[in-house]
Amino acid sequence: MKIDSIKVFGERHSGTNAIGYFAGKNFNLKFQHYDFLGWKHRLAPKKDEWSKFEIQNCLFIFCMRNPYSWLPAMHKEPYYDHYPKIKDLSLENFVQFSIEDYENCITMWNQKNDSYFRMSEEVPNSIIINIEDFHADQKKFHERLADLLSRQNMPLVKMNDYVNGRGRHEQKDIASSLQVPALEKSSINIINSFLSTETMKKCNYKLLT
């Protein structure tokens, strides 16, 4: 069957908007929204849920980001209205603070990314992309999509603007925002105490020491 749509999953600040826009624009694919398997930032649905949907024509895109740059981004804007004062916490307190149904942001990162790997192996059409790799070499990701979709003759339309749920913005320095910041040793130790080494390895990220 010909793939004609995409459903993007990934945590907040992991490039879901930019990567989804890129795939849709370059290959003329329509977006599947909330009514198709829910919130894009959720834990990936299990087979007993997604099997109730027509997924044969859909490409599932799973977006990931290095936790050491992702956590400061979440700290700055967690998009978490249940506890507005969460933004007032220090980074070290924030990364240990309960969020959604998870012990903290780090365990949430572990579990959600694990769920994306699991679902990517279950569904017929899927691709996993690290946001850092996408911004470093969009041509390579375009080639991966072209091979997967068997549409090698599509021209490359690069995505150089920052994109969030409110649209495209040219003023943000994306490369700098994706760099791992200089974290305090105490912060690194706290983060590492919760990070799954197995998940880090699957995501092709390395633990800071």
Regions flagged by a language model, labelled:
Residues 20, 142, 196:
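Generic structural marker for isolated residues within well-ordered, non-membrane alpha-helices
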